[in-house]
């Protein structure tokens, strides 16, 4: 074996300490880096080769640790962790900021008429469906029926919320009306994510001890995981949908946007994008990817099995998802 690197760097785990918020934030700033969507197929395949070779104990001569980690994050950004298949471009985590800034900016610009609300809420939920399908579990893949049910339900919920609130806010200030899209997105997340992961709520998700030894499946762990994801998704959208209304409400009274009203959408998209560049990774980092809960919070049957085999165990761990 040749090369400068030791063969025992654990590239299956993130580079930074995931028990701290700072470590998780660094990880997600790298994972959601929009520049990764500009990488060519040749660059993606080169990163895949470096990762696969290293996992097999082959260390290319001259490869540095920074280059190895860069290859690992490029690989993770484009290939499914379970199946190894290349993911749909707009479904990758690196596409979240550019896609969401465009869709969110347009939702918040064109919110006054029913056709515009219908169209942009439909676009947003269609994008969410692509993301959820792209990042589906390889062990328990989504069925077409589950995906369709979640898609239709979330779209209906978002549109109903937006149209209902639009009707209620017609008699209040224009500023209040600008927050309708955020309420619609929050409502859709509360519908979409639990429906998309309904199988986990029924049969549970794998729980392990600290060393990764599988102990069983828990629906209680699934509830905690899904709640954390819903909270982080809503908070992720909040800065990009709560800050721009104040800015745009002021800017649209200025001479520039009165003279060039068509500039409202590009300006709004830019403001939303600036917010999302920071909000996306920071809100992904709110909760550890490897979450934990007390054994006493599990189902009685699973508690009994764990106490029988591991009487000293106090906490179990599980992957919360994204």
Swiss-Prot record:
Record's keyword terms, sorted: Acetylation, Amino-acid transport, Membrane, Mitochondrion, Mitochondrion inner membrane, One-carbon metabolism, Transmembrane, Transmembrane helix, Transport
Mitochondrial matrix topological intervals: 2-102, 168-174, 250-266
Instruction: Point out residues bearing the modification N-acetylserine.
Output: 2
> GO terms for CC?
mitochondrial inner membrane
Q: Which GO terms describe its biological process?
A: L-alanine transport; L-serine transport; one-carbon metabolic process; serine import into mitochondrion
UniProt subcellular location? Mitochondrion inner membrane
Q: What one GO molecular function would you report for this record?
A: L-serine transmembrane transporter activity
Which parts of the sequence lie on the Mitochondrial intermembrane side of the lipid bilayer? 121-146, 196-228, 288-322
Reaction catalyzed: L-serine(in) = L-serine(out); L-alanine(in) = L-alanine(out); L-cysteine(in) = L-cysteine(out)
**TM segments?**
103-120, 147-167, 175-195, 229-249, 267-287
UniProt-recorded name of the protein: Sideroflexin-1
Which gene name does the record give? SFXN1
């Amino acid at each position: 074996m040749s090369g400068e690197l030791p063969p025992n760097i654990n590239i299956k785990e993130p580079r930074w300490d995931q028990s701290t918020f700072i470590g998780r934030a660094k990880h997600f700033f790298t994972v959601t880096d929009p520049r990764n969507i500009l990488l060519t197929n040749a660059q993606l395949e080169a990163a895949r080769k470096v990762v696969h070779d290293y996992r097999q104990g082959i260390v290319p001569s001259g490869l540095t640790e920074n280059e190895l980690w860069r290859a690992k994050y490029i690989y993770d950004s484009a290939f499914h962790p379970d199946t190894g298949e290349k993911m749909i471009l707009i479904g990758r985590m690196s596409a979240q900021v550019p896609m969401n800034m465009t869709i969110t900016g347009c939702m918040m610009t064109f919110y006054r008429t029913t056709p515009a609300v219908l169209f942009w809420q439909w676009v947003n939920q269609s994008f969410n469906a692509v993301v959820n399908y792209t990042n589906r579990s390889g062990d328990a893949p989504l069925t077409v029926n589950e995906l369709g049910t979640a898609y239709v339900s979330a779209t209906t919920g978002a549109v109903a919320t937006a149209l209902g609130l639009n009707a209620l806010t017609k008699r209040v200030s224009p500023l209040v009306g600008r927050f309708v899209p955020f309420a619609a997105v929050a409502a859709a997340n509360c519908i979409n994510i639990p429906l998309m992961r309904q199988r986990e709520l029924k049969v549970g998700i794998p729980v392990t001890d600290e060393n990764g030894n599988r102990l069983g499946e828990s629906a209680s762990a699934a509830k905690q995981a899904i709640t954390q994801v819903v909270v982080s998704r809503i908070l992720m959208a909040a800065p990009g949908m709560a800050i721009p209304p104040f800015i745009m409400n002021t800017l649209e009274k200025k001479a520039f946007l009165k003279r060039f009203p068509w500039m409202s959408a590009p300006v709004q998209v830019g403001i939303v994008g600036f917010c999302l560049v920071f909000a996306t990774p920071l809100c992904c980092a709110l909760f550890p990817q490897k979450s934990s809960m007390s054994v006493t919070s599990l189902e009685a049957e699973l508690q009994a099995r764990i106490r029988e085999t591991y009487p000293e165990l106090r906490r179990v761990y599980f992957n919360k998802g994204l």
